[in-house]
Amino acid sequence: MAAICDLTGLPGLLLPWYGEHRRDLPWRADRQPYHVWLSEIMLQQTRVEAVKGYYIRFLTSLPDIPALARCDDEVLHKLWEGLGYYSRVRNLKKAAQVVMERYGGVFPESYAEVLALPGIGEYTAGAICSIAFNQPTPAVDGNVLRVLARLLDDPSPIDLPETKRRVTQLLSGIYPKEAGDFTQALMELGATVCGPNRAPDCEHCPCKGMCLGFQRDTAASLPVKSPKKARRQEDRTVFILSCDGCFALEKRPETGLLAGLWQFPNVTGRLDTQDALDAVSAMGLHPREILRETEKTHIFTHIQWNMKGIYLEVDACGGSFQWLTEKEINLQAALPTAFRQFWER
C-alpha cells in the first residue's frame, strides 16, 4: 500500500466493538453455509434493508440446497423479482445443482471448491469460508477497501485489481481465531461507521486511534476510484397492450441483458404516435385506442434505458405474445424492475 500502518491491533479493536454494536440481521441468526451463501449473493449490489424481506421469503419457499436445486425457473425468478441482477439467482440454482451432484448436497468447506461454484467470486468465497467455517479467508469488497484506504491513508484506486490483492494479503496476515466475526466486523464498520459518499463517522469509530486518514484529516477524501466511463444511453418504446382484461407479455432471449425474464413488448428508439401504432400493427395486432403515455428511466451498470411507455388497447389477443390477467402477472410472471415500473399503479 502507499502508506505504512501496523494493522496487527485491528482485530483487538474491532471484535469488542462488533460484539456490542452489530446489527440484528436475519442471516446472522446462524452460520449455516446455505444461509451465509444466500445472504451474500442477495447483498451484492443491493441494500441491506431491501434484502431482509427477500431473504426470509426465499428461505421460507426454498429452505435448503435440495429445494433450490430442483426449483422451477419461473418460481425462482418470481422469488427474486425486484432484486435485479437476475444472473445471481440463476447461478444460485446452478451452484446448488453442482453441490447436489458433486458433494451429495453438503456445501463444500474448501475455499478452492467454493470458489469453483457458479456465481461465486473471490469475495463471496472468502465470506462463506470465513463466516460459515471460521477460516481466515478475507472477504474484500467495496466496504472493506474503503475502510483500509482510510486506515492506511492510501490514495491507490480501490477498483484496481492490484489494490484488492494488496489489501487481501495484508488482511490475511492479521486474522484472529474468531475469523468469521472479524470478517463481519470489517463489513459492519464499512457499512455503518466508515461509510461511503465522503461521510465517515470518525468520532464513533473504534479504530480512529490507529487510522492515518483520521489523524491526517484525509478520511473524507478517500477512497479514490478510477474515472468512470460514461454510461451508454438507449431510447426504447415500451407497449403495455391490453385486451379483454389481459395484457401482452413475452420472454426475453435466454442470453444477454435480463435473460429469460418476462417483458412488455418494446422496440429500440423513441417512437411518435403514428410510428407506435404502425409498430403495434406490425406485431399482428389491431390498435384500438391509446390510453396514456408515460416516461420512465432504468439504469443498468453500463447502460441507461430512457423509456417511453404507451398504454394501448387492441382489438384481439393475438400476435406471438402470452396474454395474462393482472392476477396472473402479479402471481406468476417475474417482471424485472425496468418493466415492472410500468405495471405498478
Task: Please report, for each region that a protein language model flagged, where it lies by residue.
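Catalytic cores of DNA base-excision repair glycosylases
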Residues: 3-203, 207-216, 286
